[in-house]
Amino acid sequence: MAQLSITALGTVLGVWAHPDDEAYLSAGLMALARDAGQRVVCVTATRGEHGTADPTTWPPGRLGRLREVEARASLSALGVTEHHLLGYVDGTCGAQDAAAAIDRLVDIIADVRPDTIVTFGPDGITGHDDHRTVSAWATAAHRRAAADARLLYATTTAAFADRWQDLHDRLDIYLDPDLPLRTPAEDVALEIQLDGALADRKLVALRAQASQTAGLVATIGEQRYRAWIATEAFTLAPTSGGALQTAVEHRASGTPVTL
């Protein structure tokens, strides 16, 4: 598959579940697009208020508000100033009214008129249910309101999975034994290898979300962390037909499905 160029993406709309999803999976893409003068808009479904393993340092009662502030600072480091927060409670996306959530995304799409929508694939990268649900919402909204726009799913490549398997086993970040995905190179529509100033910029953006990243950086070391976050990869979504699209439609409608 021929690789896409950043400028070919046009106006970019990212749709994610929690603050920091957008930075981990697409900070380089967003920064490059903004540097090229393109419009980039970010949508986050929740404030991530349940996202801490250290409640002493990051009190849960204040975490949602803190993560909202962190997300703005992180996006600002990438040149992104347009951020929509849907306000769902962290961990409850699968229990929300899917039709209403999709309607909200349709309204945002109608306003932004993106050329490219970026979100999780149906696997949710880590298998998190919020990630998988938001993928389904974004896919359904794309079909309704922006069928002519490109839909990109964030993914992990076989090379990335191989290189970092020991770290992934140590961190235990994947909630599904079939993850991470091992997308072959020929199926990758866009891969960004960040180095130099661009890698530094992504590191700054992630460090701005200290409630999520400070502990991890301290655990594995900044240089290793910087290398780990330096790959971003995306596949073109199958936007019509096929078992994968059927699974997405079932999840968007609230019907349980195994992906």
Question: How should each PLM-predicted stretch be described?
Answer:
Residues 1-113, 140, 144, 248:
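Active-site rim/loop-helix segments in enzyme catalytic domains that contact anionic ligands
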